[in-house]
């Protein structure tokens, strides 16, 4: 059994890791770390976990017996705590944005904080699971993608790879539920402000914009810029990303659907919807699926892609476990076979 530790145990990402890893046949949750709740029983913070008798612990580097540690923490915590663990030889999967952006200047411009050391950035492997493989011996630090980038990159990757788009035309209109903001209180997520309301935010300067651009540029082999506008909607979970992109070759809905279906034929967590149907966030709730609907406006040769995920599962903890499975050469679906919760 692989001994796993979870850092940031009082947050939503960590709680999803605990929920999902309980069904993983090759994993035991050895330690749950939270610096603010040391020695408190887990069930005190999360009463729905009454059946789990573990207590929160303080993270230590010396004598740490974990094979893998998941970090579901803010980026500053990850930047400080992860390098010593990696140096010790422990595999780390980081759910924060600390190691995603390889250019330190760009990171600091968007995150408004000092970037990680360049050596740490160079060693971190950014992993959208559907196109990644690892060397178990050589890979020590995996940088889990953000939620918006996951939904967006999975939809765009086939089109960019096949070089069938005008790279200057990418527009991403994305909606997210409130859990994406974490458990910290703020006026923006106060019930009276959020309920029966819809708002755009971080226009032009969202932290996920450079992440999307960086990895689209890698796929394209040239610099790619996008227009990305996120919106906050009054629901708990879910991301719906509607992507508009001009096609540089003549495609119909049928031919683009065929390309996308072929591209993801062997990827169990990406479901290309039938022509004429488009996914909703409820249809992936609580699951590791990304559902994608496709339409081509032949008059303007514009592809419209609708991509949905659960931001806490495929957009965070589920993909982190998927990366664990790849790292240890398990079946990619191990511990992640949950059907969406419906209704």
Swiss-Prot record:
SMART domains linked: Semialdhyde_dh
Swiss-Prot/TrEMBL GO biological process terms: L-arginine biosynthetic process
Name of the protein described by the UniProt record: N-acetyl-gamma-glutamyl-phosphate reductase
Organism of this sequence: Staphylococcus aureus (strain NCTC 8325 / PS 47)
Gene name of the record: argC
Disulfide bonds: none
Keywords annotated in UniProt: Amino-acid biosynthesis, Arginine biosynthesis, Cytoplasm, NADP, Oxidoreductase
Enzyme Commission number: 1.2.1.38
First-listed, main subcellular location of the protein, grouped into a coarse class: cytoplasm
Pathway(s) annotated for this protein in UniProt: Amino-acid biosynthesis; L-arginine biosynthesis; N(2)-acetyl-L-ornithine from L-glutamate: step 3/4
Catalytic activity, as annotated: N-acetyl-L-glutamate 5-semialdehyde + phosphate + NADP(+) = N-acetyl-L-glutamyl 5-phosphate + NADPH + H(+)
GO cellular component: cytoplasm
Keyword NADP among UniProt keywords: yes
Enzyme class: oxidoreductase
Subcellular location: Cytoplasm
Key word NADP present: yes
């Amino acid at each position: 059994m692989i001994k796993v530790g979870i850092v940031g145990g009082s947050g939503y990402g960590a709680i999803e890791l605990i929920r999902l890893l309980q069904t993983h046949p090759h994993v035991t949750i050895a330690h749950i770390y939270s610096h603010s709740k040391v020695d408190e029983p887990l069930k005190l913070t999360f009463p729905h976990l009454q059946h789990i008798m573990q207590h929160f612990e303080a993270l230590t580097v010396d004598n740490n017996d974990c094979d893998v540690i998941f970090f579901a923490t803010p980026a500053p915590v990850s930047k400080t705590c992860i390098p010593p663990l990696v140096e010790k030889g422990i595999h780390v999967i980081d759910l924060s944005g600390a190691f995603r952006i390889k250019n330190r200047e760009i990171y600091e411009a968007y995150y408004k904080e000092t970037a990680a050391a360049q050596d740490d950035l160079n060693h971190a492997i950014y992993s959208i699971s559907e196109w990644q493989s690892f060397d178990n011996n050589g890979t020590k630090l995996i940088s889990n993608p953000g939620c918006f980038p996951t939904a967006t990159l999975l939809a765009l990757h086939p089109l960019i790879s096949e070089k069938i788009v005008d790279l200057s035309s990418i527009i991403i209109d994305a909606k997210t539920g409130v859990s994406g903001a974490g458990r910290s209180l703020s006026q923006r997520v106060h019930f009276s402000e959020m309920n029966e309301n819809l708002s755009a935010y971080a226009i032009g300067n969202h932290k996920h914009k450079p992440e999307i651009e960086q990895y689209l540029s890698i796929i394209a082999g040239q610099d790619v810029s996008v227009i990305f506008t996120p919106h906050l909607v009054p629901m708990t979970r879910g991301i719906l990303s509607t992507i508009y992109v001009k096609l540089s070759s003549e495609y119909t809905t049928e031919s683009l659907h065929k390309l996308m279906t072929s591209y993801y034929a062997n990827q169990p967590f990406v479901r290309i919807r039938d022509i004429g149907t488009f996914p909703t966030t409820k249809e992936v709730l609580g699951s590791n699926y990304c559902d994608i609907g496709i339409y081509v406006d032949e008059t303007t040769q514009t592809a419209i892609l609708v991509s949905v995920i659960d931001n806490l599962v495929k957009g965070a903890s589920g993909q982190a476990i998927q990366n664990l499975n790849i790292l240890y050469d398990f079946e990619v679906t191990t511990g992640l076979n949950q059907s969406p919760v419906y209704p």
